[in-house]
Amino acid sequence: MRHIILDTETTGLHPNQGDRIVEIGCIELENRRPTGKTLHFYMNPERDMPEAAAAIHGLRSDFLADKPIFASVAQEISAFVKDAHVVIHNAPFDLGFLNMEYQRLGQPPFTQMIPGVVDTLIDAQRMFPGKRNRLDDLCQRFGIRNDHRKLHGALLDAELLADVFLAMTRGQNDLGMDHPQELLSSQMNLQKSHLPTDLKVLMANDTEIHLHEQLLQEIAKKSKQPPSWLQ
């Protein structure tokens, strides 16, 4: 299966109030492996860049002045994502902008060009309820290095999201599943086992406690740091 990991940067939050896309980054996965194919454009938004938005991604009007407008790269974007499931973190945001950009050109919405969308934010909220699930949070949770991410950037964020997506959906191939939602559903449908409530509690004796402490010391010595559960 072909996936396109996609991210955008914009002039603001409201595509229906004149905000525009200023950067798009896409990475292709084929059967869960990066193919090396990417798509990346900076775009002239044909309007001013609010300072609040520039503070997030660092893109300002002088840098974007000589970049192509969306209309001139729209066909390349559609061709790149054609027939692929698109993976986005907080999909309604990016899809709202992409749909509006194509609507301005009198073309069908972006969502009609693709067979499906995976929203990693929704999947993360199901996997980690009650926790923060921003891209940075997921990188930290899955041990993905992101210390080079000082500002938001569409291609950089797509690269990080590709790693997060693969970490979140690891094992899908073995289960014969195409979507993270299916994996989560299979986990949530597991039958509960009811254990008796009068189980006898066995406490460790002094010898067992001593041996356990020796084992922890040996682990700390070999790893050159205390076991993570003691930190």
Residue ranges and their predicted role:
Residues M1-P115, Q125, D137-L151:
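Conserved non-catalytic scaffold segment of RNase H-like nuclease domains
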Residues A74, R132-L135, I209-H212:
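Alpha-helix initiation and N-capping motif
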Residues F93-T120, T207-Q231:
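Long, acidic, intrinsically disordered low-complexity segments
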Residues A167-Q231:
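Acidic two-metal-ion nuclease catalytic site recognized across multiple nuclease folds
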Residues H85-A91, F97, R134-Q191:
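Acidic, Mg2+-coordinating catalytic module of metal-dependent nucleases/exonucleases
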Residues I114-R132:
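Catalytic subdomain that performs nucleotidyl-dependent activation
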